[in-house]
Structure formats: C-alpha cells, structure tokens
C-alpha cells in the first residue's frame, strides 16, 4: 500500500530516534525523502519555521509536522504498508 501524500523526514544521521525510524523504513521498504538538518541549512530553517522547534525526527505529511519516533512509525505502518 502506498500513499498519495507528500512526505519528508527531517532527521540527523546521529540521532538514535531518527535511526529507529529509518531502520523501520529500510526493513519495510518504505521510501521517504530525507532532509538532513545538519547538512542542509534550509531544511533546518524549514523545520523551525513550520514546526516551531528543531526536534527530529519529524515527518512532514502534506506540510504538517509529526514528531516522536513511535508516532511516526505508527503513521507509516498505517499509511504506507
């Protein structure tokens, strides 16, 4: 099952919660564009501007932020598998 929604995962490669989400995605064949806020200053600014905080992981779903790794995994499981 796929989704017609626009998705982006804002993350840092060293963040254990980001790694948890990305591992779930890898194990389940879920592909979501990644935005590394450490390497991409525009991504970091967007995260704060739209989401109101610099917290990762953050899954943007049609431009709306969803935080917390367990919540992100639950959403991905329900909407992309």
Specify the residue positions occupied by each region the protein language model found.
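Thiol/disulfide oxidoreductase modules built on the thioredoxin-like
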Residues: 48-55
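Polytopic alpha-helical membrane proteins, predominantly small-molecule transporters/carriers
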Residues: 69-72
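A short, hydrophobic beta-strand/beta-hairpin element that forms part of a small beta-sheet core
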Residues: 57-65
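Short secondary-structure transition/capping segments
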Residues: 2-3, 45-48
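Local sequence-structure signature of Cys/Sec-based thiol-disulfide redox active-site neighborhoods
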Residues: 1-30
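Short alpha-helical
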Residues: 16-17, 42, 67
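C-terminal basic regulatory modules in eukaryotic proteins
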Residues: 61-62, 75-81
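Thiol-based oxidoreductase modules, predominantly thioredoxin-like and allied folds used
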Residues: 30-43
